[in-house]
Amino acid sequence: MAELLACLQSISAHAKDMMALARSRGATGSRPTPTTLPHFDELLPPNLDFVRTRLQEARLPPKAIKGTLSAYESACARWKHDLEEAFDRTAHSISPHNFQRLAQLRTRLYVEQVQKWLYEVLQVPERWKAEMEKQRAHINATMGPDKTTGPGKRSRPKFHSEYTPVLELYFHFNAYPTYADRRILAEKTGMLTRQITVWFQNHRRRAKGPLPRMSPTAKIPMEEFERQLENLARKIVPVLLPPTLRRFAPGNENKSLAAASRQSAGKSSKNAKRLSELEKAQQVPRKPSENAEAGPSSLGAMLARVMHNDSVSKKKSKKAKKEKASQQNVVCDVEMRDATATKEKRRKMKKLPRAAGQPFDVPMDVERADKASRKAMKKAKKSPRAFDSRAELAFAQAAYPSPSQYAYVHSRKPSAQKPSSDSPRKDFGQLGKGRPSSNSTSSTVPPHRVSSRLNAMRPPYAFPAPYNAAAVPLTFSVASSTQFAFATDNRSFGFAERTPRKATVPAACTLIDYLISKFAGLRLLCVEQSVSSRSISLSTSESGKLAGLRTEGLTTGEASGVQTHVDSYAARRAITYVPPSAPLDCVVHNLARALQLKQVRPMVLAQPVVQPDAFAPFIARAERRARRKERKQRKALEEKQAKKDRKERQKASRSQRDSPSMDADVQSRASSVASTSSLPARKSSKKSRKSKGESAASSRATSVASSVRTPSLSSTSSRRSSGMSMPGTPRPEQDLPIMATADFNFAGDEDVTMTPDLAAQLFGEDEDGAAALGQMQYEEFSPDMLTFTSTAGGALSDMTADVNMPDLGNAYTSQQSVDDMNWTGFGLDAQNSASPGLFGDESNTGLDWLLSHNLLGDTQMSDLSYTAPTSTPSQINILGSTYACELGGSDSLGTPFNMNDWTFGLGACDDGFAGFGNNLLGGTAVAV
């Protein structure tokens, strides 16, 4: 190669000298004759009929045949287009004498690549058949062989009960699995999705109490899941029979397991001796002893036989007694129980008369066993059954192979580094005790969970094993035998990469092509140096070739620095580039300048590679269902509320129409009050209290039947149902809140208008039964009405009962003088006004003052005369409307003093508040 470069440099130097000599003698360069484009033969398309026939003979599915042919045809078409475009561009800079060789190179490259792809396509049927055989074997191994009872009957799928703990573990977190979870559970357990669905339905039907339910996007808490999984493993693993106690069938003896268990457990002479005895018991079949009882499984009989042999072989010495005591004191980590055996039903035997010397607990038809055997059986029953963790782990690894390679579909594949043989053995006795360490292999959950909440759903007894991709066949969900994609270069297609050759002697044809291309480049350089840039114009192809030579460094002064690689894509593979436009030799020395001149383009994929998420459609569907369910619930609530409001309006209109029927209740209350005056004092007081309670109850009942816009005055539940916020009743030491009409929000569109019927329902009617809104209402006043109570709940429950009962103690607190009764005319002091801040006895202030002056005892009522007090108007604000309250007496001064002459009335006035006292009547302030 060095000699070739030296020759080329000398040729270039001689050519330049010749051009300089000709230029010095006045010669001018002739215009180069345009090269004629060669005519290449048409590249023949691949024979698709032959490929289709071969695939059909292999019994490939029609869909797979169609996909394979379309991919093969499109790949060949792309390769043909790339070759034609590349060789057409290259033909401009090549001598016409080399057109034939260039055409041969073009045809050879096309045919070789098409033949390689044809070989790959014809290998598809074999791969597909092998894959189908693996899947059939996997199905037969997990689901059992196909057993059809008739020509038109399907076999019932087998339910794998060994995976029931896995389903129960999932049920502990979520009793309503989604379709995606049920599908994954079916793949993990080797069952059908329908079987998983039916199992969860039956389990939910039998379950008691509230069932757990998770949203479709929620994830199982993995810490609790791992803890439950380890607890489940501790419950299931002891059920498995260890290899030291398992009797192998003839021809299936596994000596490696016995040797491994002997090596792990044979650290002490006692363990080795016991293992040897167990091996002898397995190899030599012994006849069942006459005194041994038949158990539900072979496990109990084997343990009893071993313990019997130990008790017989050991001598009664101090050392044996010490060993026996230490063996009884050993606390085993897991108690061994045979949970797989069915419980035997024992028949109750009638007690028969026993023979002479026969014990009480033995039936008559059972032969008496010897004393030694009965003692041995008692010792065997009392001895603990220890669980060997190491032997159990060895048995589980042998009984259950390595997990499927698709257990890591949504997680990171474990490292393929094999542990060294001299590494210390892990302590598998700590299995299930606490959280596993980072380097422990006892955890059954693969790390790095990414997208699914069922990544770790594997049987708890499938212990980690070396990852072997060929051990477990593909499944239907992963195998995609109908999708093929062909690329236009070898590296993308999967063949061996084209690496640069070493500095060896190239082939003759390659050397000739190389020399031709280099001489063409030298010719262009000589033309550039010989003539001026304005005297001659180069074609587009020649200008591009010249720019490429400049990029490669093939200038006049740098011709000695040329480096060549005969068959190289190394520069293009250094970073990711577009596949070569032509399969010719090309080396880029100045990569930055080549990118700047757009000679080399970085490869940009037409479509971004997106890893599809298999669970995205199911999650989106679940979210749409949740939104649809929420809309339905909201609509149902709105319809229910509208129906309720409609019923309330109908009820309110019905109550307004039936308002005359309320007059009977008011008249009965008036008659009960009138009847109290004719009874004795004690009976009348009791009767008045009773009538007062009845009137309050009737007023509450009438207030409930009022309009829906009128707040209820009787119960808290009705206020809650009406949707109003009622003001609370302040305590005696608190100030009254400032309220207005706007503070009461009602359900209607209009404000409450006080009608005569509503006023009669709230405050009662007079004796004549005619109540008008603008008229005064009078009711007889009795001393029993001087005591008032206030509700502690803050509701207007007693307003209708107490609104017509004025307070004498606060009657004149708003006036400057309380001597309006002209008590000074009788020679008495003026009455002291009650303090406005107290509530305890202010209602009885007037009577206490009269009794203190002995006016009711010695003084005759007929001798009293007084001046009628001026009427004291007051205001009561109830339900947004204001009413006037007036307290006065008779105009006659000569009439005797009578308490019944004191009357008061209510009348309508404008909204507003004026001069409040401190008397609380059912949560409403009454200003008097």
Curated annotation (Swiss-Prot):
Give the DNA-binding residues.
Answer: 152-211
* Compartment(s) where it occurs, according to its Swiss-Prot or TrEMBL record: Nucleus
Q: Kindly indicate whether the keyword Nucleotide-binding belongs to this entry.
A: no
Looking at the UniProt record for this protein, which Gene Ontology cellular component terms does it annotate, in alphabetical order? nucleus
Keywords of the record = DNA-binding, Homeobox, Nucleus, Transcription, Transcription regulation
- SMART domains given for it? HOX (SM00389)
GO process terms (BP): sexual reproduction
Q: Where is there biased composition of kind Low complexity?
A: 668-682, 694-728
Q: Which PROSITE patterns does the record associate with it?
A: HOMEOBOX_1, HOMEOBOX_2
Q: Where is the composition biased (Basic and acidic residues)?
A: 635-657
In Swiss-Prot or TrEMBL terms, this protein is called: Mating-type protein A-alpha Y4
Species of the source? Schizophyllum commune
